[in-house]
Amino acid sequence: MRQPFQPVHPPRGRRAVFVFAALAGALLVAPAHLAAQAPDPSDIAEGARLFRQKGNCQSCHGWAGDGRKMDTQMPDGANLRETRLDRAALIMTIKCGLPGTGMPPFDKFAYSDGRCYGLKQADLRKAGQRMSDPPATLQNREIEYIADFLYAKVIGKGPMNHEKCIEFWGQETEACAEFPK
């Protein structure tokens, strides 16, 4: 005889089937929800603007992201066309810079609380590292726009040529003249 207020459980066999069915259903539906969406063209355009203007990334990385810097007084930037960084590592690098290199942190609070590689300003000082100041700090969404732009137009796209140059700028420009037609 059952005691009052005792929970009623389905037999183990039915419970196992229910749990299995629920997990299988979740696995079938999850990829559709977890798939990365392609960035909106306006986000890519905003990322290009931020790369060229506010972040002034081209001064070190070159307008094409190929490491051919545009300002000789700036540190040498990486060739972003050949980088193997995934999106998360790219965003972390933009936010936190790279200690020991010329890559500055664009996150206003980088190294204030351990969010960057688990380090704080005191850790950098102790190691004799000084981070360069960025031309401007960027909001998280702005950093994501730059990543959208880089993955759409630069990373993994191979060396720049005349056709890619026109596509990059959206029209024939003076910069494209250096590439044979």
Labelled PLM ranges:
Residues 1-13:
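N-terminal secretory signal peptides that target proteins for export/translocation
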Residues 59:
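Short, cysteine/histidine-rich loop/knuckle motifs that typically chelate Zn2+
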Residues 31-36:
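Sec/Tat signal peptide C-region and signal peptidase I cleavage site
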Residues 37-45, 53-55, 63, 101-181:
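Flexible coil segments in periplasmic/lumen-exposed cytochrome c-class electron-transfer proteins
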Residues 18-30:
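Bacterial N-terminal signal peptides
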